[in-house]
Amino acid sequence: MVSCDKFFGEELTDLIFDHGKFEMPDKALFIGNSLLLGNGAFGMNATDSTSDYHAVIQRKFLKANPAYTDTKLSGVDFEACENRAQQMNWLDNRLCPVLSEDLDLVVIQIGDNVNTSSKREAFEQGAKELIATIKAYAPRARIVWIYGWYVSNSVIKSVKNACKQYAVTLVAIDGINKAGNRSSIGTVITRVEPTSQSLNYTRYTVLSDNRLQIDFNVGGKKYKAIVQTESYSDNTEAKTLTWQGYETITTDKDIASHPGNNGFEQIAQRFFEVLNID
């Protein structure tokens, strides 16, 4: 029985079905896009691996059930599919190998990158195929769909139709995408693995403990950030710093449009709210 489903055009709203009290899972699968794995091992643009929506949800589940485990699967290639053959290839070769009968929960968090007419046309049926495949190979799993930080009318319709057909709970997060919940240029990200970054600077200062304070411009605006480095080099002619270490600086506006830590916290809280998880 749908208890919350208001259709005004293609407004994105929660879909809540009566599946009984939410039982804390033993084993879960998260299928997501950049909000799950965009910063390598964690969601873009959380400042570290403990601050994205998955980490917040995982902590609550582990507190209730220390034996809880989960797996993360990138769904960006499924979002990119332009026909059914491509979708079935992904379902068969990427999704099915990680599905199992002992899964208690599958969280889907895709749809934001379905951004061309051919992708949207394919996704209309693909969203249903995705849920059907999960139900076939993980029959015990409760399925929850989280959408959408970035939205389009056609994808809203496809996601809602698929969720309605299979009685899948839909958690709407579009209302969270606003100032204060997004990341920002200049945000420092701590990676799980060491990496390197190059950045054109206006000036920089070497601080203690191998830290660099870097002043730089993006789009005519001035920014300042401090990063911990393991080593660095300076191309003085090009005024370009290159450093190695675990920390990077957000310099791209599209990356900065993703959730920041506060946005991810609110996404997780919406998940708990819709599923009535204390």
Roles of regions detected by a PLM:
Residues 1-23, 278:
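Bacterial Sec-dependent N-terminal signal peptides
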